[in-house]
Amino acid sequence: MLVTFLGILGLLASQVSSQLVGQLRPTEDPPEEELEYWCAYMESCQFCWDCQDGNCINKIDGSVIYKNEYVRPCSVSRSMDKCMYDLNKGIYHSMSCSDPKAWNPYKYFRKEWKKDEL
C-alpha cells in the first residue's frame, strides 16, 4: 500500500514539475528553462532567436531564417493560469497556461534561409 501511494505521489510530482508555476512579471527575457514553452506558441518573439549578420537561428530547434519583420520584440507574463504575450502596438494574446494554443500573426513574414541562396 505504501509503495503504491509513493508511486502515485511521484507521478503527480513529475507532472506538476513540467507545468509552469508561479507568476512571471512582464518581461522580454523569460527564464531560460521556460523558453521552449513560450517559443512553442509564439515563435516570432525576439527572445526565441539569436540574430547576427541578417540571419537568425532559433534557440529551440536550430532552424535558420532571414531577419525581417518576422522576428519581433515581445514581452510575456503569467498570472495564475493565464499566459500572455504583448507584441506592442496593441497586439495581445492571452491563453490558459495549462491548455495553450499556438498563435502567430507574423507567420507570413517568415523566410527560411537556404544554403544555396547568396
Curated annotation (Swiss-Prot):
Keywords (alphabetical) are: Early protein, Host endoplasmic reticulum, Signal
Q: Motif Prevents secretion from ER residues?
A: 115-118
Please state where this protein is localized: Host endoplasmic reticulum lumen
How is this chain modified after translation?
N-glycosylated.
> Could you name the Gene Ontology cellular component terms for this entry?
host cell endoplasmic reticulum lumen
**First and last residue of the signal peptide:** 1-18
What Pfam families does UniProt report for this protein, alphabetically? Answer: v110
What triggers production of this protein?
Answer: Expressed in the early phase of the viral replicative cycle.
Instruction: Indicate where this protein is primarily found.
Output: host cell
- Note the superkingdom of the native organism: Viruses
Against PROSITE patterns, the record matches this protein to:
ER_TARGET
What this protein is reported to do is described as: Plays a role in virus cell tropism, and may be required for efficient virus replication in macrophages.
**What family, per the record?**
Belongs to the asfivirus MGF 110 family.
Name of the protein in its database record: Protein MGF 110-6L
